[in-house]
């Protein structure tokens, strides 16, 4: 029944998704304003969702142009469906323009197809189809749309300051069948304090170093600019050997007497950096072999001492595991250095229930002072958990099982979704077990089958939660 309903809307679903994907909704603080708090792209994507909602007869409510909602249904209780329309930067290496959607016979290719524009449109159409069926709603629905999920969650922070908290809800921002627990997440900077000037003339001076754009992505590119005072050829040969030994791609060029070294890695989501290749940490590992100036030597030595090959926090003294949520993970997403202001490591740390975060951070902060570094802590989101046997969770899982015959149990993840904003919130799709996960990677795509099947599952789930008694 539900899949047949969705079939009637397939062309509309694709067309509306294409329109949303064509918006480059990457956060841009340089162009932020009161009318576009995280930049014009995210604001445009939010307005686009309002436009299709108004076209279809829904009421919307805007919250300071950084978040908002589409409203449906009636009743005392509220089902929240928490989506986001911002995306991470496209990065390099795409086979097509990431913001000009390519529709093939089987798939749609563009940045945001999986995370989270495709699932957002799927959830929207589930609501629209039920509305078109003139169902007798028993709950209200607030489809909450954010514009800063990929960075600081300013959108939901602002939204929930003034807006009604849903009774329960789900975020279509992960995987089926249902994710009922999420690790704690924090971002923080490890900031180098400027050291004394060099007493002796160093052989090499690190001018600048840059790797990474987002704390929650493994950097796939790194660049160092080094003033080489002698033996330039030897350094280049050593670098080429280093790349070969570590099975890396990279390059070396000379620009106005400055040696420019680059390393290419593999970008993946920061919730499991062990499956990526951190270009920045590898390039710092090579630089440690050079007789650098004092500041730079301290910077690269710190990286090797605490960060390189420490995806689970081992070198930081934070290794920890639970059976429910798994391991602490540690992603070094941003690395910067310049010879005027010293360096910074931007960290995305994720931790399971039971990890004594504050105690671990205090101990680490005290330890690294001796090496000229300090911790500047950002936002801390504690672990989030809903019992998988809760009737709400079971209704979602039943809808999934009815349409897939897959009896996989709900589980927990290291990623963070909007679900943690709710007392009774979970992540529900839209990826399936056979979906290729290219979130935050080049050539991101969603298959038409996945898009339509997710819409059908959301349709049944929302019906069971908001229409059936």
From Swiss-Prot:
This is Putative dipeptidase SAS1677. Keywords: Dipeptidase, Hydrolase, Metal-binding, Metalloprotease, Protease, Zinc. CDD domains: M20_PepV. GO terms for biological process: L-arginine biosynthetic process; proteolysis. It comes from Staphylococcus aureus (strain MSSA476). The active site is at residues 86, 149. Its EC number is 3.4.13.-. The keyword Zinc applies. GO terms for molecular function: acetylornithine deacetylase activity; dipeptidase activity; metallopeptidase activity; zinc ion binding. PANTHER family: ACETYLORNITHINE DEACETYLASE, N-ACETYL-L-CITRULLINE DEACETYLASE. Zn(2+) 1 binds at residues 115, 150, 440. InterPro entries: Bact_exopeptidase_dim_dom, M20A_pepV-rel, Peptidase_M20, Peptidase_M20A. Belongs to the peptidase M20A family. Binds 2 Zn(2+) ions per subunit. Transmembrane segments: none annotated. The lineage of its organism: Bacteria, Bacillati, Bacillota, Bacilli, Bacillales. It is an enzyme of class 3 (hydrolase). Its cofactor is Zn(2+). Coiled coil: none annotated. Zn(2+) 2 binds at residues 84, 115, 173.
């Amino acid at each position: 029944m539900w899949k047949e309903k969705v079939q009637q809307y397939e062309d509309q679903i694709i067309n509306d998704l294409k329109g949303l994907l064509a918006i480059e909704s990457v956060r841009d603080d340089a162009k932020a304003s009161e009318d576009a708090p995280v930049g014009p792209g995210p604001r445009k994507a939010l307005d686009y969702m309002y436009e299709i909602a108004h076209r279809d007869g829904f009421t919307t409510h805007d919250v300071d142009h950084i978040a908002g909602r589409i409203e449906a249904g009636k009743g005392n209780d509220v089902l929240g469906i928490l989506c986001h329309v911002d995306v991470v930067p496209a990065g390099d290496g795409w086979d097509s323009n990431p913001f000009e959607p390519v529709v093939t016979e089987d798939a749609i290719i563009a940045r945001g197809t999986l995370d989270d524009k495709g699932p957002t449109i799927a959830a929207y159409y589930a609501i629209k189809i039920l509305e078109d069926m003139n169902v007798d709603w028993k709950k209200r629905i607030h489809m909450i749309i954010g514009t800063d999920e990929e960075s600081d969650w300013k959108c939901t922070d602002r939204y929930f300051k003034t807006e009604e908290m849903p009774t329960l809800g789900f975020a279509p921002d992960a995987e089926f069948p249902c994710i009922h627990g999420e690790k704690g997440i924090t971002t923080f900077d490890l900031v180098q304090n400027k050291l004394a000037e060099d007493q002796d003339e160093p052989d090499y001076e690190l001018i600048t170093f840059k790797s990474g754009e987002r704390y929650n992505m493994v950097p796939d590119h790194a660049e160092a600019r080094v003033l080489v005072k002698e033996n330039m050829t030897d350094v280049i040969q050593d670098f080429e050997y280093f790349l070969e030994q570590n099975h890396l791609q990279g390059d070396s060029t000379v620009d106005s007497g400055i040696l420019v070294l680059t390393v290419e890695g593999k970008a993946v989501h920061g919730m499991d950096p062990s499956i990526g290749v951190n270009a920045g940490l590898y390039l710092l590992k090579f630089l440690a072999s050079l007789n650098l100036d004092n500041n730079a030597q301290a910077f690269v030595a710190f990286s090797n001492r605490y960060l390189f090959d420490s995806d689970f926090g081992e070198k930081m003294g934070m290794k920890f595991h639970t059976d429910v949520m798994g391991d602490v993970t540690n992603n070094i997403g941003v690395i910067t250095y310049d010879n005027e202001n010293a360096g910074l490591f931007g960290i995305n740390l994720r931790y399971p229930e039971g990890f004594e975060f504050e105690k671990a951070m205090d101990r680490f902060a005290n330890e690294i002072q001796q090496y000229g570094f300090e911790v500047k802590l950002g936002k801390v989101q504690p672990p989030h958990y809903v019992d998988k046997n809760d009737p709400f969770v079971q209704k979602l899982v039943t809808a999934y099982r009815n349409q897939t015959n897959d009896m996989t149990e709900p589980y927990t993840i290291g990623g963070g979704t909007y679900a943690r904003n709710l007392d009774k919130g979970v992540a529900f799709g839209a990826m399936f077990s056979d979906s290729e996960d290219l979130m935050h990677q080049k050539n991101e795509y969603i298959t038409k089958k996945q898009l339509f099947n997710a819409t059908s599952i959301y349709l049944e789930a929302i019906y069971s939660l908001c229409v059936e008694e």
